[in-house]
Amino acid sequence: MEENSIKIHKWLYPASWLYGAGVALRNKLFDWGKLQSKSFNVPIICIGNIAVGGTGKTPHTEYLIKLLHDEFQVAVLSRGYKRHTKGFVLSTAESDARSIGDEPYQIQSKFSDIRVAVDEDRCHGIERLLTLKEPPVEVILLDDAFQHRYVKAGLNILLTDYHRLFCDDTLMPAGRLRESAQGKNRAQIVIVTKCPPDIKPIDYNIITKRLNLFPYQQLYFSSFRYGNLRAVFPDCATVQERKLSSLQTEEQILLITGIASPDTIIRELEIHTRNIDLLAFSDHHNFSQRDLAQIKERFGKLRKGQRLIVTTEKDATRLICHQELDEGLKPFIYALPIEVEILQNQQDNFNQHIIGYVRENTRNGSLPERKDAHKS
């Protein structure tokens, strides 16, 4: 395995012990029934993690949408982190990253035929979704809700970063775990994300032993597959799409990220060019006028004729909202989309696991059998 990037602040262990005691007590109250988890008469799939930072929740949620939405009426419910609204909001054609959050808006932009909603109170959000008719919701995907135990999901999918496995981490603030690694026991599926596409068989075995899962838990490994660069402002761009392979080694890229961990996208771009100027912001960062001015200044320092601005799909949703963004920059801004690939020839098994759960628990038991396994 590659050396992990985990940094533990040992001097913060006392604070972590206090934090851990509080989290453990909360989990025990749910286990003992003192705090109630609510079940719903609809298949609910929770996608989450037990660590702060990016593990690829949104790309994996999009994978599930692609897998299910041709057959079932899919809804996605998120908290809508850093949105400018409160309460339950159902996405519409007028929604943007400000009203529903960047990740829900990204999902709605790519899948206009599903319902996307946000609500801080997940139980209330589910209840509102279940009142929708024509057609009724048949499966709900809960984004980043592994610690939201007031909802009892029928299928819990836990993600852990290949470069930062939860078994190597410790509780906040010394580490990045939201709860003890024992929280993994609530998951029926564990996915090791962001794996190298050429991961060695011995690494599968090492990670499997280190995660130490129970027999009822299924373990999968996934990797990111990058698509073509797509113009964020297509009306301004002379080229709508560019293959990564078309990048020239001398081409200069200003990479703008507001995500938890930009390492993966940096590694991908470095395959094609070494001339990368990184402008990194915090996760879900709301770009200010000062930030936009900094982007313009940094881009202006790159050689004319051989320069490009690359950002993530999530960051693109927030850039689009800004009327203050310099018009001269728009033709040069491209988003780099990512898709999830299940490794080890386990894609069909994973797909059938998900589809089987939804079929067995849907309120509409008369759905026809799926003829072909999903291929992505």
Curated annotation (Swiss-Prot):
Gene Ontology BP annotations: lipid A biosynthetic process; lipopolysaccharide core region biosynthetic process
Pathway named in the protein's UniProt entry: Glycolipid biosynthesis; lipid IV(A) biosynthesis; lipid IV(A) from (3R)-3-hydroxytetradecanoyl-[acyl-carrier-protein] and UDP-N-acetyl-alpha-D-glucosamine: step 6/6
Pfam annotation, one family: LpxK
Catalytic activity: a lipid A disaccharide + ATP = a lipid IVA + ADP + H(+)
Domain of life the protein comes from: Bacteria
GO cellular component: plasma membrane
Annotated SUPFAM superfamilies: P-loop containing nucleoside triphosphate hydrolases
Gene Ontology molecular function: any one: ATP binding
Key words of the record: ATP-binding, Kinase, Lipid A biosynthesis, Lipid biosynthesis, Lipid metabolism, Nucleotide-binding, Transferase
Enzyme Commission identifier(s): 2.7.1.130
Residues engaged in binding ATP: A51, V52, G53, G54, T55, G56, K57, T58
Function: Transfers the gamma-phosphate of ATP to the 4'-position of a tetraacyldisaccharide 1-phosphate intermediate (termed DS-1-P) to form tetraacyldisaccharide 1,4'-bis-phosphate (lipid IVA).
PANTHER family: TETRAACYLDISACCHARIDE 4'-KINASE, TETRAACYLDISACCHARIDE 4'-KINASE, MITOCHONDRIAL-RELATED
Similarity-based family: Belongs to the LpxK family.
Protein name from the UniProt record: Tetraacyldisaccharide 4'-kinase
Gene that encodes it: lpxK
